[in-house]
């Protein structure tokens, strides 16, 4: 089985037989290298660990190229089980799914996602597993194309891509406004391939690799100093509410009054130009709010001269569905943004006839949202055009290009109480930092229990609220104008460039075989 899927014929010099124990050790080593990537991401942010963990995979691939797919798959499985272990918290601890169902489901997503590093490893070894120019062309390009496909196929799940580990501490983060997170992915993989080559290279090659690495990483430092967008108008004061409502209480009828009062009091005590409440902060449909509540909220906002927006479920205009929306409550017309990129299994149920029975064991209200539609206009609040995205939507950089180009700032509303006290909320904050860097715009994050934050256009955090506390985070933000190179061209240059590099690696191989 291993031989059949591992790309036989990659390396004629490989032994024809390998002991099962050696194969097992190699697979475990790959999985362990993948698992350690957890510490490259937030909250640990050891960005230098990602190229090292990926270089460990490269070393294993060059030792045993015939098992390339399985080594890449083991690396991916270790990485995604480690990074997404919070899935168990959301399924078992919060949604109430029995452990005997939750535990296997935790492995399903990593088992699927690991296919992409497996296929990327197989493809690179199929082209040429030996350290050299063709490997440097093939491996990083194959890896990035795998990451791109992972973020696109079956609605996509780009969370945990290697490039996010570089946001914002690494010099490579400077490339995000240039080519987005996918260019950073590519450079991480290129760094890993070059790092693994150092051990086998001659002195002249080592010097060349080190000079190239210094130029690439040093250029990232220079790119970080470029201001890709410019201020527009005056700064405004912003207030971001964090209600800290436990997920098991959020939709409870007994806790409804407490939830509504929590956010009313936060609005009443706040003085700012713009205030944003988190995703589904008001746990009722808009037209089901208690009589007078909306007037009270508007009254407090009006007295403070404050624009107010809140996450709240809203029925579709035809009444047949419902939307995960953000409504401008202070505007009598109540314009809204409705989430378009829904979370599979969380906000809609794929294949309900096949897996619908699982939801009978779960406490998961509102799991059948309707998409809001693409190209929704930004909301105008406090004289600013604000492009909203809801929770998981800020995982998709290219989808935010259009909204960001029509707006002066970005805002994300989220409810991360689903994931308990895990790394999920810190990882999600890092995604938002990447979006700020890519678009050169402020990102205002209002979350239920963390990480509520104000992120500057350079991706750095201006202010952040302590998680698991009820508070209102205040600070300043300013609209920006102009487009970063990534906003102009999107992912296409990186994807086409990686395809061209793979083709070049193949052509060089054919040329070499022709000469012999």
From Swiss-Prot:
Sorted UniProt keywords: Acyltransferase, Cell inner membrane, Cell membrane, Membrane, Transferase, Transmembrane, Transmembrane helix
A GO cellular-component term linked to this record: plasma membrane
Protein name (database record): Apolipoprotein N-acyltransferase
Record-level Gene Ontology MF annotations: N-acyltransferase activity
EC code: 2.3.1.269
The gene coding this protein: lnt
Role, per record: Catalyzes the phospholipid dependent N-acylation of the N-terminal cysteine of apolipoprotein, the last step in lipoprotein maturation.
Residues passing through the membrane, by range: 23-43, 68-88, 94-114, 135-155, 178-198, 489-509
Main location: membrane
All copies of domain CN hydrolase, residue ranges: 241-481
Pathway membership: Protein modification; lipoprotein biosynthesis (N-acyl transfer)
């Amino acid at each position: 089985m291993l031989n059949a899927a591992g790309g036989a014929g990659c390396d004629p010099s490989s032994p024809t037989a390998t002991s099962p124990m050696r194969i097992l050790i190699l697979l475990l080593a790959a999985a362990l290298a993948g698992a350690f990537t957890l510490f490259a991401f937030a909250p640990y942010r050891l960005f230098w660990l990602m190229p090292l963990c990926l270089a460990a995979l490269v070393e294993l691939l060059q030792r045993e190229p015939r098992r390339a797919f399985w080594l890449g798959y083991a690396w991916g499985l270790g990485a995604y089980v480690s990074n997404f272990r919070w899935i168990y918290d959301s399924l078992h601890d919060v949604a109430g799914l029995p452990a005997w169902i939750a535990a296997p489901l935790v492995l399903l997503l990593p088992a699927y996602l690991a296919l992409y590093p497996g296929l990327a490893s197989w493809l690179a070894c199929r082209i040429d597993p030996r350290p050299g120019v063709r490997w440097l062309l093939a491996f990083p390009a194959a890896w990035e194309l795998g990451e791109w496909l992972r973020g696109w196929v079956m609605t996509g799940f780009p969370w945990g891509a290697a490039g996010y580990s570089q946001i914002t501490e690494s010099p490579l983060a400077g490339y995000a406004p240039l080519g987005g997170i996918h260019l950073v992915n590519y450079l991480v993989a290129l760094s890993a391939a070059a790092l693994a080559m150092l051990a086998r290279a001659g002195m002249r090659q080592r010097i060349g690799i080190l000079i190239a690495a210094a130029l690439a990483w040093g250029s990232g430092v220079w790119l970080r100093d470029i201001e890709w967008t410019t201020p527009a108008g005056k700064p405004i004061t912003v207030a971001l509410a964090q209600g800290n409502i436990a997920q098991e209480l959020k939709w409870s009828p007994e806790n409804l009054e407490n939830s509504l009062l929590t956010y009313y009091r936060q609005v009443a005590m706040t003085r700012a130009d713009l205030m944003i409440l988190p995703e589904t902060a008001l746990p009722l449909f808009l037209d089901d709010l208690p009589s007078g509540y909306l007037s009270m909220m508007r009254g407090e906002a009006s007295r403070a001269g404050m624009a107010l927006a809140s996450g709240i479920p809203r029925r579709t205009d035809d009444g047949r569905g419902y939307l995960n929306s953000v409504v401008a409550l202070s505007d009598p017309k109540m314009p809204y943004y409705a989430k378009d990129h829904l979370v599979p299994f969380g906000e809609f149920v794929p294949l309900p006839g096949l897996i619908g029975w699982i939801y009978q064991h779960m406490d998961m209200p509102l799991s059948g949202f309707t998409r809001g539609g693409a190209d929704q206009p930004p909301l105008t609040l406090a004289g600013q055009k604000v492009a909203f995205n809801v929770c998981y939507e800020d995982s998709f950089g290219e989808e935010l290009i259009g909204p960001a180009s029509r707006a002066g700032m970005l805002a994300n509303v989220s409810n991360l109480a689903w994931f308990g006290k895990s790394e999920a909320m810190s990882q999600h904050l890092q995604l938002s930092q990447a979006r700020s860097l890519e678009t050169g715009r402020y990102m205002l994050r209002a979350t239920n229990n963390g990480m509520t934050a104000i992120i500057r256009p350079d991706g750095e955090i201006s202010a952040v609220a302590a998680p698991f506390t009820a508070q209102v985070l205040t600070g300043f933000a300013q609209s920006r104008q102009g487009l970063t190179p990534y906003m102009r061209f999107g992912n296409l240059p990186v994807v086409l460039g990686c395809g061209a590099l793979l083709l070049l690696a193949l052509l060089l191989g054919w040329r070499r075989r022709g000469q012999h």
